[in-house]
């Protein structure tokens, strides 16, 4: 149990059988009446946010999230098969759990998989990946002065904007949080 007076951004609590992460909170002490805490909570599974008001000193259960390191193996058509790096157990993760991050998955990539009450509620991908460019328009000498960009298709199928000097066969570092080209490797 955690007192609402001890809320900090990032603390995970359990409400109505679901895990919520504290996004914002504010202690309010009105001139008349007792103090209360107004919090903005993000549902860890769905990503939706909700505002909730708690009485001062109220205690709520802390949600115990289990984060396990898993290695992505392959896509079986229904989901993404990953292997636990500790006990080598293989599980299939639904496409909904990975969401938009699926376009960055590569074989043998290490993922952080979040479990709540034995169910997968989220997948943390690494912030940066290194991928090979499989298709892009050839760069023309002297095109680098304008800072122009072109599309490049990566080995995972993702398409990113890259500078004109990048060619097919180059290995790039990509920030997958934003989908932006960082550098040639």
Curated annotation (Swiss-Prot):
Keywords of this entry: Cytoplasm, Elongation factor, Protein biosynthesis
Taxonomy, superkingdom: Bacteria
Location(s), subcellular: Cytoplasm
Pathway membership, UniProt: Protein biosynthesis; polypeptide chain elongation
One term under GO cellular component: cytoplasm
UniProt main location, coarse: cytoplasm
UniProt keyword annotation of Ubl conjugation present: no
Official protein name in the record: Elongation factor P
Organism lineage string: Bacteria, Bacillati, Bacillota, Clostridia, Eubacteriales
């Amino acid at each position: 149990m955690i007192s609402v007076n001890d809320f900090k951004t990032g603390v995970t609590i359990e409400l109505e059988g679901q895990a919520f992460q504290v996004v914002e909170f504010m202690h309010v002490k009105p001139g008349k009446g007792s103090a209360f805490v107004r919090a903005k909570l993000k549902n860890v599974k769905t990503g939706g946010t909700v505002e909730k008001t708690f009485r001062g000193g109220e205690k709520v259960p802390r949600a115990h999230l289990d984060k396990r390191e898993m290695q992505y193996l392959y896509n079986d058509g229904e989901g993404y098969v990953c292997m636990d790096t500790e006990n080598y157990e293989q599980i299939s993760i639904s496409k909904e759990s990975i969401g938009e991050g699926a376009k960055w998955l590569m074989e043998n990539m290490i993922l952080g998989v979040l479990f709540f009450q034995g169910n997968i509620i989220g997948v943390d991908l690494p912030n940066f990946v290194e991928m090979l460019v499989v298709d892009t328009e050839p760069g023309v000498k002297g095109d680098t002065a304008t800072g122009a960009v072109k599309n490049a298709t990566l080995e995972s199928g993702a398409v990113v904007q890259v500078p004109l000097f990048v060619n097919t066969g180059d290995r790039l570092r990509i920030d997958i949080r934003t989908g932006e080209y960082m550098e040639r490797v």
